[in-house]
């Protein structure tokens, strides 16, 4: 029995599982029969190509099935192989999924489905199933460990419709230093969007919307820190960025209504109930929309 067979001899993962099948194909390759020959460069292209073929044309139902397979693979797979290979395999898979969802498709429906399918794991940043905290490389290359998180990528590209969904699920509130996201929105240089060729004016409008959304989530936004960066020679993407940060986030007392929103959202966030838990509250629809960052 070959070493690769010994490593992957038992599994509780069904044969129809995309990731189990992909792993089987990799370890059965003649060139990978001995551990000493295994290397990132040997299997990364095959993993990427296999998943890219699916993700390029997948619809929401197909993406749902793919995420279900990945969750089952991570949770139930009985495969046994070296820790380094396990890390490489899962990171390549996650990098490919995030790359296609955020950098290639840029579809809010796919982003929301990813958040819904993995929300039970989001409180543990180290979990392989907490996909929203994993990093990916926006211009695909086999180096997922040196990438950025989806939230930072969306802030860089100012995709306001996707940014809003991430915030509704409490992703910004979970950030240790949310001011870094604000700084990215204001100061990060314009970059070419992969999927949609929009005018610079549209990017400016999206940046304004992203700033407004941040003000609905945060109680404090350090304008002083932004100005410090400007004094060092950095240039804002919108000249009137100051107009989109309420004075109650950096100078005047914060509104009581906004503090109530933050308190309720924080309680729901603690119980992993954002955003669905908002709509189970017995309050008027307008207040539900306020809590859900619609207004």
Curated annotation (Swiss-Prot):
Membrane spanning stretches: none
One cellular component (GO) term of this entry: cytosol
Pfam families reported in the protein's UniProt record: SOCS_box
Pathway entry: Protein modification; protein ubiquitination
Alphabetized UniProt keyword annotations: ANK repeat, Ubl conjugation pathway
CDD domains: SOCS_ASB_like
SUPFAM superfamilies per the UniProt record, alphabetical: Ankyrin repeat, SOCS box-like
Tissues expressing this chain: Specifically expressed in testis. Not detected in other tissues tested.
Repeat region (ANK), residues: 146-176
UniProt domain SOCS box: residue ranges: 232-295
One annotated GO biological process: intracellular signal transduction
InterPro entries assigned: Ankyrin_rpt-contain_sf (IPR036770), ASB17 (IPR039147), SOCS_box (IPR001496), SOCS_box-like_dom_sf (IPR036036)
Function: May be a substrate-recognition component of a SCF-like ECS (Elongin-Cullin-SOCS-box protein) E3 ubiquitin-protein ligase complex which mediates the ubiquitination and subsequent proteasomal degradation of target proteins.
Similarity comment: Belongs to the ankyrin SOCS box (ASB) family.
UniProt remark on domains: The SOCS box domain mediates the interaction with the Elongin BC complex, an adapter module in different E3 ubiquitin-protein ligase complexes.
UniProt protein name: Ankyrin repeat and SOCS box protein 17
Organism: Homo sapiens
């Amino acid at each position: 029995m070959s070493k690769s067979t010994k490593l992957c001899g038992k599994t509780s993962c069904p044969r129809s599982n995309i990731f189990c099948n992909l792993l089987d194909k990799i370890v059965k390759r003649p060139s990978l029969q001995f551990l000493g020959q295994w290397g990132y460069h040997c299997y990364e292209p095959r993993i990427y190509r296999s998943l890219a073929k699916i993700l390029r044309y997948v619809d929401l139902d197909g993406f749902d099935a793919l995420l279900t397979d990945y969750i089952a693979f991570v949770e139930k797979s009985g495969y046994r192989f070296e820790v380094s290979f396990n890390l490489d395999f899962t990171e390549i898979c996650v990098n490919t999924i995030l790359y296609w969802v955020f950098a290639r498709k840029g579809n809010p429906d796919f982003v929301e489905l990813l958040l819904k399918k993995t929300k039970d794991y989001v409180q543990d940043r180290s979990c392989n199933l907490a996909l929203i905290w994993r990093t990916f490389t926006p211009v695909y290359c086999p180096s997922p460990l040196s990438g950025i998180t989806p939230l930072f990528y969306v802030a860089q590209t100012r995709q306001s419709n996707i940014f809003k969904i991430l915030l509704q699920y409490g992703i910004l509130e979970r950030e240790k230093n949310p001011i870094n996201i604000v700084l990215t929105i204001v100061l990060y240089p314009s970059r070419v969007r992969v999927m949609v060729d929009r005018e610079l004016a549209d990017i400016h409008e999206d940046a304004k919307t992203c700033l407004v959304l941040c003000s609905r989530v945060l109680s404090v936004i350090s304008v002083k820190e932004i100005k410090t960066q400007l004094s060092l020679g950095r240039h804002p993407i919108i000249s009137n960025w100051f107009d989109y940060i309420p004075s109650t986030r950096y100078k005047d007392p914060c509104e009581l209504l906004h503090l109530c929103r933050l308190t309720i959202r924080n309680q729901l966030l603690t119980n992993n109930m954002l955003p669905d838990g908002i709509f189970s509250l017995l309050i008027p629809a307008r207040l539900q929309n306020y809590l859900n960052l619609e207004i």
